[in-house]
Amino acid sequence: MEYTVNQLSPVKTQVTVSVPAEEANAALASAVAMFRSRTDLKGFRKGKVPSSVVEQRFKKEIVSEATTDLINVHINEIMGELKLSPLSGLDVSEAALTKGEPLEYTFSFEHAPAFDLPEYKGQAVEEEDVVVSEADIESVIERVRKNLAEVKPLSDNRPAKDGEIVSVTFEAFEDGKAIPGVRAENFELTLGEGQALPAFEELVKTIASGNEGEGDVTFPADFINTELAGRTVTMKVAVHVIKERTLPPVDDELAKKAGNFENLDKMREAITMSYKKSREDLHRSSAQKKLLDSLLATLDFPLPPAVVEQQLGQMVEEFVGQLERRGKSLESTGKTLADIQGEMRPRAEELVKTQIFLSAVALKEELTVTPQEMDAFFYRLSTQAGQDVIMLKRYYEDNGLMIMVRDKLLCDKAADLIYANALVTKVAPVEKPAGEEAQD
């Protein structure tokens, strides 16, 4: 076997392979022998069927298997010599071995471009320090109270107030005609928590339980559904039920219900530790991304198109899945698939560029991923997804996704290595707008 390499672009290579007749004959003979050993035909003992009969009976299957096996052997050998790792699937030309004849075929693949790594160790970066205030702790306790609150329907037919839960059916109209996609039945929301447009909530608060009402609502100019952005519509609303939330007192009993804590002080200690740890992780992640962004800004190299498209496809699929889980469709956003792809493409390109950079760092640092680290990844994933870890791992194996997982873990290790060798300066935390901390 001989081959020639043609660099189609900085990120794509084509290999042309020439197979002499002798090698083709050997591959076919090996396939015939394998088929002969497992063939069971009436009139012959198993494994004793004449080769000529086997060739005649299974000619198509023999040629297919011999060709596939030989090409796979060649590709593994060639890729090892080229020291290139495909970032996308290999595109192999059609080929079929013929007895006594040479064979030529090609395969192409996308890979990382060649580039010089910047100095990634000893880089300066600022990381926000963590300060846990009393207000932070109180906001968490307030969320605990809301989660453990007693909720019951109101008996009197009055309009709802902030903090109360309403169940409504609504529909939007314009010039007397219903607007498609702007309708919901038995929609439940808590007033005063920003779960709906302020104008819509104000309208709901004018309608008593069991009654209907209508009013004009103007959608903001930056509304997610671009077809509704900036438009004023007539919203017809029916309020079915109003529920009152009674918060439990802040005492030792609350602590026991919240997490079987011994008393309120123990719960506050646990909240403080958990809050501090989550903020430390958040600030570290933010600083790490800032450091990576600064390193990536010094690099300029082409990206493999197929890899970008694959990343973009995954992101769009995840976005559409999130919409569907919320009972919405892509059409409900007022955007086309092309619109979403256009908005997400820069992020997809950024992710691919980051992956290529971190993979190069991992290679230079000779980082590896152990089987135990792979198992730990699937354990965490199964816990998050609520799925059996063995079945989840088998799915990844059956769908050829294990290399993707390994590469992700390698990139994570490379990012951690860069940050571990950075010159980190702690700075005072940036003050956030009121209420934003409570959302973390």
Swiss-Prot record:
The keyword Cytoplasm applies. Gene3D superfamilies: 3.10.50.40, Trigger factor ribosome-binding domain, Trigger factor, C-terminal domain. It is found in: Cytoplasm. Keywords: Cell cycle, Cell division, Chaperone, Cytoplasm, Isomerase, Rotamase. InterPro entries: PPIase_dom_sf (IPR046357), PPIase_FKBP_dom (IPR001179), Trig_fac (IPR005215), Trigger_fac_C (IPR008880), Trigger_fac_C_sf (IPR037041), Trigger_fac_ribosome-bd_bac (IPR008881), Trigger_fac_ribosome-bd_sf (IPR036611), Trigger_fact/SurA_dom_sf (IPR027304). GO terms for molecular function: peptidyl-prolyl cis-trans isomerase activity. It catalyses: [protein]-peptidylproline (omega=180) = [protein]-peptidylproline (omega=0). GO terms for biological process: cell division; protein folding; protein transport. GO terms for cellular component: cytoplasm. Its EC number is 5.2.1.8. Consists of 3 domains; the N-terminus binds the ribosome, the middle domain has PPIase activity, while the C-terminus has intrinsic chaperone activity on its own. This is Trigger factor. The gene is tig.
